[in-house]
Amino acid sequence: MFIGTYNHSIDSKNRMLIPSKVKATLNEVTFVYLSLGFDENIDMRLESEFNQFVDNINNLPIGSREARNLTRLLLSQTYKVEIDSASRILIPQNLIDKAKIKKDIYIIGTNDRYEIWAKEVYDDFSLNQEDTLSDLAEKLLINGI
């Protein structure tokens, strides 16, 4: 399970040093999968979590245009990225651009993945969500989640 929030940055070559607490949860893997997230962020998954994610996508109805488009958009923008000897990953430029990352980032643990957010984008998201936390919890708990 991935949890926590880490304030970090990327260098001028689009490399992100994986924080030691995050690295400790990655079980000494040598690569991760990076893909475009749903909220102007980048998702970082281990292979097992990525395989589960793909299984979920594969269960979408192939006859649905929306399902096919979602599959294309998600998987065509997914990269298997090596963790180098200095515990860094190279984030592809198109993901950097789509996530609006300049330099400062947050790495957010969200149970089955880490999300990489541009600091400004996440700060805006957080401000807009704090007032609705109790509303979201109430709605989801009523529905048994």
Swiss-Prot record:
GO CC entries: cytoplasm; nucleoid
One GO MF annotation is: transcription cis-regulatory region binding
Q: What is this protein called?
A: Transcriptional regulator MraZ
| Compartments, record wording | Cytoplasm, Nucleoid
Q: Which UniProt keywords apply?
A: Cytoplasm, DNA-binding, Repeat, Transcription, Transcription regulation
What residue stretches are annotated with the SpoVT-AbrB domain? Answer: 5-49, 78-121
Assembly mode: Forms oligomers.
Q: Which InterPro entries match?
A: MraZ, MraZ_C, MraZ_dom, MraZ_N, MraZ_sf, SpoVT-AbrB_dom, SpoVT-AbrB_sf
Q: What's the domain of life for this entry?
A: Bacteria
SUPFAM superfamilies for the chain:
AbrB/MazE/MraZ-like (SSF89447)
Q: Which family does it belong to?
A: Belongs to the MraZ family.
Q: Name one GO biological process term.
A: negative regulation of DNA-templated transcription initiation
List, alphabetically, the CDD domains matched.
Answer: MraZ_C (cd16321), MraZ_N (cd16320)
Q: Which organism is it from?
A: Ureaplasma urealyticum serovar 10 (strain ATCC 33699 / Western)
